[in-house]
Amino acid sequence: MCQGIKLLSDLCKNLTIIFILNSKRMKTLTKEIQDAITPSMALQILQDGNKRFVSNLKTNRNLLQQVNETSDGQHPFAVVLSCIDSRTSAELIFDQGLGDIFSVRIAGNIINEDILGSMEFACKLAGSKIIVVLGHSKCGAVKGACDHAEMGNLTALLAKIKPSVDDEVETKDNRTSKNSDFVENVAAINVKRSIKAIMEKSAILEQMIKNREIGIIGGMHDLSTGKVSFYSETAFIS
């Protein structure tokens, strides 16, 4: 009986959090709300936000109020690794406000020590509940890797994407950026390789995932529609 009451109480609490974060007038995240969010709830919030974005139903926010309310601290529920592409702002495509998301951006959404350190800070120290590795269609960095481009410091960055090019074995001919299907296949593989790299190269994040403290998932943002599709096979979420 007591267990049933507790489950009902937890369900009501979860529904309350989801309602608060998806209401027409979004509230600024507090430590209490952040603590109550589970990894699966965090994913649902992002999915709901993207649906609003695609439907052009942006949440009404008082950004100046959020500036004031986050001036002494922040409690983001998610960390999103995405490309630097100007069309892929995580806060916009997931319809979130100030203090909601740690946005980590680098061309080609690749993984290195600095990226991992940023994620460890976001999750272990700041309390975020989910990591999203977000690729996007028509990615210039992926195209550069497909074409084996070389230019200054960009050469070393593209070298981190080239293993994804090699892993794409479906395409036999026209393995260049002119083949859009090839580019999109490589972009998807690159997201999945980044998920694997996070798990392998960060003992802190791997342990938090195993302990179900945080979740991780990969996804792809379609620049033509704005829709984000998540890869269920990459998900480690409770």
Where are these regions (language model features)?
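Short helix-loop-beta junction
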Residues: 93-103
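Glycine-rich, flexible N-terminal cofactor/catalytic loop recognition
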Residues: 58-59, 65-78, 83-88, 94
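Short glycine-enriched loops at secondary-structure junctions
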Residues: 82-87, 107-110, 136
